[in-house]
Design a protein with these regions (language model features):
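Alpha-helical bundle regulatory/interaction domains
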Residues: 1-71, 77-83, 100-125, 133-156
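Generic hydrophobic, amphipathic alpha-helix propensity
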Residues: 36-40, 88-93
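Alpha-helical structural segments
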Residues: 90-98, 145
Length: 156
């Protein structure tokens, strides 16, 4: 993944900042109001909304929320019992697996791009580190598993 120059925000970070500002301007009720209750909830919201995109730098979110990164990390851990980095990885992996399960299969380069990787090999490395299989190998096995399950159900 290529690095952005310091001070340059990714599109996903700009969207998050605009959403934070819009929520503050008109907090309303319901889910929007609950997001503003704690910075940890807001961070989780953006991680989920971006599917764990690698271009979402959580320090940018912390700064916009007016808290130190370390404070946000502690708040997140206290509320969700895992670090933001762990949650971001978990979210990214789950989303990539869901895209790789689609039939016809989503191209690995498309999955990598959706998750913010500028270089497909970086996504492949991430995926293999998490699953011990390449994305294409995991996808093939998952499609075979799904097909065998469907074949079994049709015989029953």
């Amino acid at each position: 993944m290529s690095r952005r120059p310091a001070g340059t925000l990714s599109a996903i970070e700009n969207e998050a900042i605009q959403e934070i500002r819009a929520l503050r301007a008109s907090p309303g009720e319901g889910i929007h109001a609950s997001l503003l209750e704690t910075p940890a909830r807001m961070a989780r919201h953006f991680i989920l909304g971006s599917h764990g995109n690698v271009q979402l730098r959580l320090a940018t979110i912390a700064q916009e929320l007016g808290v130190e990164m370390r404070t946000l990390e502690r708040m997140f851990f206290d509320e969700y019992d895992q670090t933001m980095a762990e949650f971001q990885l978990e979210t990214r992996l789950a989303f990539s697996k869901s895209l790789l399960c689609i039939f016809p299969p989503t191209k690995i380069s498309a999955v990598a791009a959706i998750l913010g990787y500028n270089v497909v090999q970086d996504f492949n490395r991430f995926f293999k580190k998490q699953t011990h299989k390449s994305p294409s190998e995991w996808s093939r096995e998952e499609h075979a598993r799904i097909a065998s399950g469907e074949a079994q159900r049709s015989r029953d």
